[in-house]
């Protein structure tokens, strides 16, 4: 793709998200979503092949359906409230339809079907954008309308997402699909706390983006897309492979790594609000996520058959992929837990 064309498309996608995040007018929010959608399709198909085209088509159809539902909810709300501003959703039907549309855009269960397939069919860079930047716009709208959301619907979707995110990743050997199911589970944790403490949702999103960014950058540095290719990199880049596994354990929420922070704080906040069954169920379901990350780490590092490196002088060549801020991201993705007492004051 021409660099100028790619820069223009990327700028449009960023502008669309920024319009959604900064607008208080429903029509501008819808326009921002459409700008972002039309610009992100060529980014998903940057390396043109049938799989990328299929993934981009699935993404477009899902997001277009969600946008249609969103506009329907906006019009219903306009009929009852006679205003375009995001203050309160006055009609229960509009609230349910709007929540469904935003859940579909985020890839939460039961509308999660597109996330693993789309992520698997696109390159690692596009997958990184899809699982991080593309979550910001719908989550910012959910953040703004949190007081008007149907609580039962949101909690059901959150619990299902945590369950699907853990259950779906159990049999996967593709790293991109594992990251997709991890994303579904993390989105479930964020929406579970949204109505109780929106600030904690924002903090959870920040930590999730940081960990996902680190993991994808390490995948790109190591050129790994499957668990088999990851296990074969031990004798070539043992340090990077070890860091990938530690970061993935952090994504699973293993203490004392950074990924444990959001789970700890969310369970604590839900318990403060006299909710016992919900956090208990979430913690049990989160063990599924941690299990497949632990199994991946075990199978990749401890059960690998001894092999020699047949690629001579591999260590003498300088890696052309320069990622200068990766060490900082790795430290923040794994060692933030001591800062939890400070973060707990951000209510």
From Swiss-Prot:
Q: Name one Pfam family in it.
A: Proton_antipo_M
* GO BP, one annotated term: mitochondrial respiratory chain complex I assembly
Q: What is its EC number?
A: 7.1.1.2
Q: Which reaction does it catalyse?
A: a ubiquinone + NADH + 5 H(+)(in) = a ubiquinol + NAD(+) + 4 H(+)(out)
- Asked if the keyword Transport belongs to this entry, the reply reads yes
InterPro entries tied to this protein: Complex_I_Subunit_2, NADH_DH_su2_C, NADH_UbQ_OxRdtase_chain2, ND/Mrp_TM
| Keywords, sorted A to Z | Electron transport, Membrane, Mitochondrion, Mitochondrion inner membrane, NAD, Respiratory chain, Translocase, Transmembrane, Transmembrane helix, Transport, Ubiquinone
Designated gene of the protein: MT-ND2
Regarding the membrane, this protein is recorded as: Multi-pass membrane protein
Q: Which organism is the protein's source? A: Ceratotherium simum
What is the recorded name of this protein? NADH-ubiquinone oxidoreductase chain 2
| Similarity section | Belongs to the complex I subunit 2 family.
| Location of this chain's protein in the cell | Mitochondrion inner membrane
Q: What does this protein do?
A: Core subunit of the mitochondrial membrane respiratory chain NADH dehydrogenase (Complex I) which catalyzes electron transfer from NADH through the respiratory chain, using ubiquinone as an electron acceptor. Essential for the catalytic activity and assembly of complex I.
Q: Name one GO molecular function term.
A: NADH dehydrogenase (ubiquinone) activity
Which chain regions cross the lipid bilayer?
Answer: 1-21, 25-45, 60-80, 89-109, 111-131, 149-169, 178-198, 201-221, 242-262, 274-294, 323-343
Give GO cellular component annotations, separated by semicolons: mitochondrial inner membrane
| Keyword Electron transport part of the UniProt annotation | yes
The record describes its quaternary structure and partners as:
Core subunit of respiratory chain NADH dehydrogenase (Complex I) which is composed of 45 different subunits. Interacts with TMEM242.
